[in-house]
Amino acid sequence: MEVHGSGFRRILLLALCISGIWSAYIYQGVLQETLSTKRFGPDEKRFEHLAFLNLAQSVVCLIWSYIMIKLWSNAGNGGAPWWTYWSAGITNTIGPAMGIEALKYISYPAQVLAKSSKMIPVMLMGTLVYGIRYTFPEYMCTFLVAGGVSIFALLKTSSKTISKLAHPNAPLGYALCSLNLAFDGFTNATQDSIASRYPKTEAWDIMLGMNLWGTIYNMIYMFGLPQGIGFKAIQFCKLHPEAAWDILKYCICGAVGQNFIFMTISNFGSLANTTITTTRKFVSIVVSSVMSGNPLSLKQWGCVSMVFGGLAYQIYLKWKKLQRVEKKKQKS
């Protein structure tokens, strides 16, 4: 009975993680799309300062991670010192800002699809720079994802969708998403390097260090430079409290979502987390299509299916590889 009870508790915990990640990030996507397309107030002004979301997100996540460390973490656990995150903090500030800014030029579903193709630059750099040889199925995954994103980008966007964008410009929007992926790649590699050098580093330590530097860099950019948009963004929020409320909810969703991601990775591993977040992106596109009143065409849905088919196949390949490793461990 105890074994069954333990298994049932794990199922409940997994269900909690799935519902937490899905609800937090799907709603955050809705808020992100709202802030990038909606016209606020009687003067129908757009919130043009989308990069300000990064600063707000960093501040909320910094406070959240500090509270979690005080409540749950062991003090002086020998984790990475805060200053080691300075370089990853730079790319983690620039990359997501570019991804958010892309929403001025392309639709939310297009942005989600483009940002789902993270494996493409990873495999490209691995092949060209490090001479890594990948298997045929891995190349097939990349082909499906790259093909789906490329065809989606080439298909004509509806006039209704274009009218909601602040500055429609597909090439610029996709270029910003590509740069976002490149910076994310450096950020992830740096975080892995820090974790390997300081094995006792916990997830909350990483969250605190990254968001501390993110807050510092964003504050300098937003308020320290002559062209900084921080004061304009705050003034906009004062004039349009509805936008300020949406920004606060956006940040809370991000903090809650990160909490469930860390919980998933620590209890079920990174593969389970990848599966949950990948399916969440697909649902986000469906929700965006329904709620925005801009349903995708059959061809566009075909492209979406290509991308997530490739991602699903990649997850399956990782699972098979994990199974082989486990069998080898059992034999030895």
From Swiss-Prot:
Organism superkingdom: Eukaryota
GO molecular function terms noted in the UniProt entry: antiporter activity; UDP-galactose transmembrane transporter activity; UDP-glucose transmembrane transporter activity
Bilayer topology annotation: Multi-pass membrane protein
Motif Di-lysine motif: positions: 327-332
Inducing stimuli: Up-regulated by stimuli that trigger unfolded protein accumulation in the ER (UPR) (e.g. DTT or tunicamycin) (at protein level).
InterPro entries, A to Z: SCL35B1-4/HUT1
UniProt GO BP: embryo sac development; endoplasmic reticulum unfolded protein response; nucleotide-sugar transmembrane transport; pollen development
One Pfam short name: UAA
Coiled coil ranges: none
Cellular localisation: Endoplasmic reticulum membrane
Broad class of the protein's primary localization: endoplasmic reticulum
Entry domain remark: The di-lysine motif confers endoplasmic reticulum localization for type I membrane proteins.
Function: Essential sugar transporter required for the transport of UDP-galactose and UDP-glucose from the cytoplasm into the Golgi and the endoplasmic reticulum, to ensure quality control of protein folding. Essential for pollen development and involved in embryo sac progress.
PANTHER family reported in the protein's UniProt record: SOLUTE CARRIER FAMILY 35 MEMBER B, UDP-GALACTOSE_UDP-GLUCOSE TRANSPORTER 1
Official protein name in the record: UDP-galactose/UDP-glucose transporter 1
Organism: Arabidopsis thaliana (Mouse-ear cress)
Lineage summary: Eukaryota, Viridiplantae, Streptophyta, Embryophyta, Tracheophyta
